[in-house]
Amino acid sequence: MKLLLLHPAFQSCLLLTLLGLWRTTPEAHASSLGAPAISAASFLQDLIHRYGEGDSLTLQQLKALLNHLDVGVGRGNVTQHVQGHRNLSTCFSSGDLFTAHNFSEQSRIGSSELQEFCPTILQQLDSRACTSENQENEENEQTEEGRPSAVEVWGYGLLCVTVISLCSLLGASVVPFMKKTFYKRLLLYFIALAIGTLYSNALFQLIPEAFGFNPLEDYYVSKSAVVFGGFYLFFFTEKILKILLKQKNEHHHGHSHYASESLPSKKDQEEGVMEKLQNGDLDHMIPQHCSSELDGKAPMVDEKVIVGSLSVQDLQASQSACYWLKGVRYSDIGTLAWMITLSDGLHNFIDGLAIGASFTVSVFQGISTSVAILCEEFPHELGDFVILLNAGMSIQQALFFNFLSACCCYLGLAFGILAGSHFSANWIFALAGGMFLYISLADMFPEMNEVCQEDERKGSILIPFIIQNLGLLTGFTIMVVLTMYSGQIQIG
């Protein structure tokens, strides 16, 4: 036995056993560190010491503790129920939590009350309900901070609408140049520019705003650019195929002139009809108050067909002296003029709605929408002016009614600002986005192709094709730049 006690291995095992027993004793461990023993009550006392006074907390001090933990920040009066019980996975307000524990303004929360309140705090933290509530509140605060002031909204809105409305007065300035080649090519560029801006504005800004998300998030801009790329790819491919097929057909029929020599060309036929228009032979195309002063005869059937193929500018140029030298009674003005004026006024009202709602969101949202509408209104107002003249109005009347319909944009601006300031503007953005897509693709795209037909008949296909591409890509680039860098450019 003595030998066993003196054995080194036994002594080592005994020493390790005694050391283990000493380490597992809390008092021994605490005394080894020179620190007092930690108890469960110590944590409660620490909270009361940091947030309260003495040995208790007031209701406001407990609320400060909850705010620090992001608990009790709900809107209050929660009425959600799940199978007859209140949904506890909801962010409650501090008032709701205090009511559940029968706390009043005069209550003092001591250790026992705080210990009973701790499971409530733990449940709210575990449900993470208040985390999403805080994120939503922060996003709302950031949105409110980013919104322009009322002065900026009305000031920039009125300025943009005024510039757009002045486009209606530009129609008279271009009448002398309507027969020039550069006028039709300039008009072609502006139509293509309008298509690019309207389509891109709806794609990059109006549609995402209608659905309520930021277009700069989740690669939306790059994906929308691919959507525009698909549209542009098919447009480019179709035009190239038409150019190649036209050249092939011309080469194939290059020696078949015997049939066409016996018939006058379409250009010669149109020039003959224009000469008759100037001489007053086609009196049914001229207003009654003018045809009574001119000698006329009934046109042939072929001449009616040719007249139908003439552009509005051709007819207007032949009748300009009759329209401009004499006043026109309202009863002599065609119904088409009043239909154009009313429809244009409604169109401008919706444009104003889109501009007003856009400026309530941000200044750059309003500017980008205004740029798209301006690019669309410039060729649109020029075309309306010519149609009003051709329908029987004098220059003064056409300018007045064209400007009057343009002023409907002011009324739409006021409604858009009021609706965007007090209600959700998403519905207005959805309406404007659909309208922009329709105008660009269903209305202006065929008009762009129609303007190109005369150049295509003359054989100059490449120049109109280049102008179309420049207009489309310019409009697309403007909208992309305004969308990508709207938050980095400061105004004022």
From Swiss-Prot:
Post-translational modification note: Ubiquitinated. Ubiquitination occurs upon iron depletion. The ubiquitinated form undergoes proteasomal degradation.
Induction pattern: Up-regulated by iron (at protein level). Down-regulation upon iron depletion occurs through proteasomal degradation of the intracellular pool. Up-regulated by tunicamycin, a drug inducing endoplasmic reticulum stress (at protein level). Up-regulated by lipopolysaccharide/LPS.
This protein's record includes keyword Oxidoreductase: no
Impact noted for substituting N87A: Decreased N-glycosylation
Motif stretch (HHHGHXHX-motif): 251-258
Glycosylation sites: N77, N87, N102
Extracellular-side positions: 31-157, 208-224, 419-424, 482-492
UniProt signal peptide: 1-30
InterPro entries: ZIP, ZIP_Transporter
An annotated Gene Ontology molecular function: monoatomic anion:monoatomic cation symporter activity
Disulfide bond entries: none
Highest taxon above the source species: Eukaryota
Cytoplasmic compartment segments: 179-186, 246-397, 446-460
Coiled coil: none
Effect of mutating L441R: In HCIN; loss of localization at the plasma membrane; loss of Zn uptake activity
Topology class, membrane: Multi-pass membrane protein
Keywords assigned: Cell membrane, Disease variant, Dystonia, Endosome, Glycoprotein, Ion transport, Lysosome, Membrane, Neurodegeneration, Parkinsonism, Signal, Transmembrane, Transmembrane helix, Transport, Ubl conjugation, Zinc, Zinc transport
Motif (XEXPHE-motif): 376-381
Associated clinical condition: Hypermanganesemia with dystonia 2: A metabolic autosomal recessive disorder characterized by increased blood manganese levels, neurodegeneration, and rapidly progressive parkinsonism and dystonia. Affected individuals present with loss of developmental milestones, progressive dystonia and bulbar dysfunction in infancy or early childhood. Towards the end of the first decade, they manifest severe generalized pharmacoresistant dystonia, spasticity, limb contractures and scoliosis, and loss of independent ambulation. Cognition may be impaired, but is better preserved than motor function.
Subunit structure: Homotrimer.
Entry protein name: Metal cation symporter ZIP14
